[in-house]
């Protein structure tokens, strides 16, 4: 980079960036390498789909401001951001070593994980640097919100930096800075999410990052988060109802864990305490005995960067469909292409694409990327140059269902709930689904037992949609959204083996009441009637 170009400000014109290979993707974003021609520097651009984020731009601007003021050797440098059509482009430093997740996948694919994926010294070295970054954020009043191996990046010199601080991590928790709303959107799987973030009862603070850090420690040793095999609703239920996970949770071959010692396991258990007040701070963790095993960045260069996939191996080339408007879509073979949103395969453009053996597009599904949706639209616009300004669309969230008005006598009758995403695609929309009749028994605000009867039609209704409508009708406390939805999902997935479940409510008990599962004080019972 020349002296003249280094003095230039970072451009907010998309034409100044030559987009190159896709180097990462998630539920709402794609990361591409790019070359900034005025600066003569290669960068990473995270392209966030604003249609899926359901967050006001006022709140996003606050997060961007926080990112721009963040300067630390263990935090990825943020350069600038701007809006292109319905995407927010975040321009950041490119770290050529890729993410720790890339390395984990590479090691597992080569079958080199039979005695654990990364050794203790490597894990300690990486996580010590992550803690340094987290300590900086927490001291400055920031919460990362999305600590995981996929967001820990490596430089070619063995340096370790945390990515996704700010906007994209902010979106992953629903974009609610105040933490005082019942409904939010969780993007992606909540495997790394702290219990208090899931419950959304009392809000959360930087200790949520410490829980995620503990899950990440397990991920670096075993190759995956403890509940990675389960769908999102099941992950929520397991995290909230079970004891905290450990190194062994979900691991079939316990032999692979033998080399991990007591100090590593103790450090994990300290992080994974359900009561956030009992978790250590980042500064306290840095003094833990386990981190005495940490080495320098040259050690990482030697131990894992030489085993890591190259940027070309990680990258997915982008195919360009002739005449396309320039929107990225993932194809079934794992590649990426530029094309129009409404792609007509009978058109000249479509025939040209097919003649080039273009892969079919992957059909998008909300079920694994959005659990709970807000009903409010995206807010004010981000002010950007006219040529790249974008009118953001309405929220893609669930529309409220129509419920028959009900009172709360001992046997309140609830009309069948018309949940969001009422018609599923494929065969399910053509077959007649048999509704499941259910009864939710719990105490109302007057401490009287009530039976709330309703029907759930598989393929039409969703557990989260039904739970939201029970709350909207005033039948269920808003704080119990997650736990009711999780147990409803449990029953409808396996109605034969789960005809009745009793579970603890997040709303708890009042005053001097003592929780009692048999009397349903602080508990609820959901049954097939």
From Swiss-Prot:
Its main location: cytoplasm. InterPro entries: Kinase-like_dom_sf, Kinase_OSR1/WNK_CCT, Prot_kinase_dom, Protein_kinase_ATP_BS, STE20/SPS1-PAK. ATP binds at residues 23-31, 46. One of its GO terms (cellular component) is cytoplasm. Its cofactor is Mg(2+). It is an enzyme of class 2 (transferase). Its EC number is 2.7.11.1. Residues 315-360 are annotated as: Disordered. It catalyses: L-seryl-[protein] + ATP = O-phospho-L-seryl-[protein] + ADP + H(+); L-threonyl-[protein] + ATP = O-phospho-L-threonyl-[protein] + ADP + H(+). It is found in: Cytoplasm. GO terms for biological process: cellular hyperosmotic response; intracellular signal transduction; positive regulation of T cell chemotaxis; protein autophosphorylation; protein phosphorylation. PROSITE patterns: PROTEIN_KINASE_ATP (PS00107), PROTEIN_KINASE_DOM (PS50011). The modification Phosphoserine is found at residues 324-325, 339, 347, 359, 429. Coiled coil: none annotated. Activated following phosphorylation by WNK kinases (WNK1, WNK2, WNK3 or WNK4). The active site is at 146 (proton acceptor). The keyword Transmembrane helix does not apply. Keywords: Acetylation, ATP-binding, Cytoplasm, Kinase, Magnesium, Metal-binding, Nucleotide-binding, Phosphoprotein, Serine/threonine-protein kinase, Transferase. Residues 334-348 have a biased composition (Acidic residues). GO terms for molecular function: ATP binding; magnesium ion binding; protein serine kinase activity; protein serine/threonine kinase activity. Effector serine/threonine-protein kinase component of the WNK-SPAK/OSR1 kinase cascade, which is involved in various processes, such as ion transport, response to hypertonic stress and blood pressure. Specifically recognizes and binds proteins with a RFXV motif. Acts downstream of WNK kinases (WNK1, WNK2, WNK3 or WNK4): following activation by WNK kinases, catalyzes phosphorylation of ion cotransporters, such as SLC12A1/NKCC2, SLC12A2/NKCC1, SLC12A3/NCC, SLC12A5/KCC2 or SLC12A6/KCC3, regulating their activity. This is Serine/threonine-protein kinase OSR1. The lineage of its organism: Eukaryota, Metazoa, Chordata, Craniata, Vertebrata.
């Amino acid at each position: 980079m020349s002296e003249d170009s280094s003095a230039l400000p970072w451009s907010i014109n998309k034409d100044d960036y030559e987009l190159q290979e896709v180097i990462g993707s998630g539920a709402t974003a794609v990361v591409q390498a790019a070359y900034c021609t005025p600066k003569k520097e290669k960068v990473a651009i995270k392209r966030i789909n604003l249609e899926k984020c359901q967050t006001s731009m006022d709140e996003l601007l606050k997060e961007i401001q926080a990112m721009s003021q963040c300067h630390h050797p263990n935090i990825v440098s943020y350069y600038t951001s701007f809006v292109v059509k319905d995407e927010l482009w975040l321009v950041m430093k490119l770290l050529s070593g890729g993410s720790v997740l890339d390395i984990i996948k590479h090691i597992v694919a080569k079958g080199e994980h039979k005695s654990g994926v990364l050794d203790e010294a490597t894990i300690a070295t990486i996580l010590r640097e992550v803690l340094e970054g987290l300590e900086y954020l927490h001291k400055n009043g920031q919460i990362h919100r999305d600590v995981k191996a996929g967001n820990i990046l490596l430089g070619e010199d063995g340096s370790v930096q945390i990515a996704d601080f700010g906007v994209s991590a902010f979106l992953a928790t629903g974009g609610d800075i105040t933490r005082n709303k019942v409904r939010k959107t969780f993007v992606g799987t909540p495997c790394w999410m702290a219990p208090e973030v899931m419950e959304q009862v009392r809000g959360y603070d930087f200790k949520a990052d410490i829980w995620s850090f503990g899950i990440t420690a397990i991920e670096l040793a075993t190759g995956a988060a403890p509940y990675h095999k389960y769908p999102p609703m099941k992950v929520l239920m397991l995290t909230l109802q079970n004891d905290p996970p450990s190194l062994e949770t979900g691991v079939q071959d316990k032999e692979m864990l033998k080399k991990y010692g007591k100090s590593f396991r103790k450090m994990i258990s300290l992080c994974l305490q359900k009561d956030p007040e009992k978790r250590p701070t980042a500064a306290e963790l840095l003094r833990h005995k386990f981190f005495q095993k940490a080495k320098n960045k040259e050690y990482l260069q030697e131990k894992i960067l030489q085993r890591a996939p190259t940027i070309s191996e990680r990258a997915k080339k982008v195919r360009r469909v002739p005449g396309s408007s320039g929107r990225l879509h993932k194809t079934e073979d794992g590649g990426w292409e530029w094309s129009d949103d409404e792609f007509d395969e009978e058109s000249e453009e479509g025939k040209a694409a097919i003649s080039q053996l273009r892969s079919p597009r992957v059909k998008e599904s909300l079920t694994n990327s959005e659990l709970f949706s807000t009903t409010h639209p995206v807010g004010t616009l981000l002010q950007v140059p006219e040529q790249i300004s974008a009118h953001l669309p309405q929220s893609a969230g669930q529309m409220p269902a129509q419920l028959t008005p009900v009172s709360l006598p001992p046997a309140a009758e609830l009309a069948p709930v018309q949940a969001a995403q009422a018609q599923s695609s494929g065969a399910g929309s053509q077959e007649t689904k048999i509704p499941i009749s259910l009864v939710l028994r719990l105490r109302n605000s007057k401490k009287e037992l009530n039976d709330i009867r309703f029907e759930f039609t598989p393929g039409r209704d969703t557990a989260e949609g039904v739970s939201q409508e029970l709350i909207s009708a005033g039948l269920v406390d808003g704080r119990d959204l997650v736990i009711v939805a999780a147990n409803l999902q449990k029953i409808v997935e396996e109605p034969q083996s789960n005809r009745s479940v009793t579970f603890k409510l997040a709303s708890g008990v009042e005053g001097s009441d003592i929780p009692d599962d048999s009397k349903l004080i602080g508990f609820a019972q959901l049954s097939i009637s």
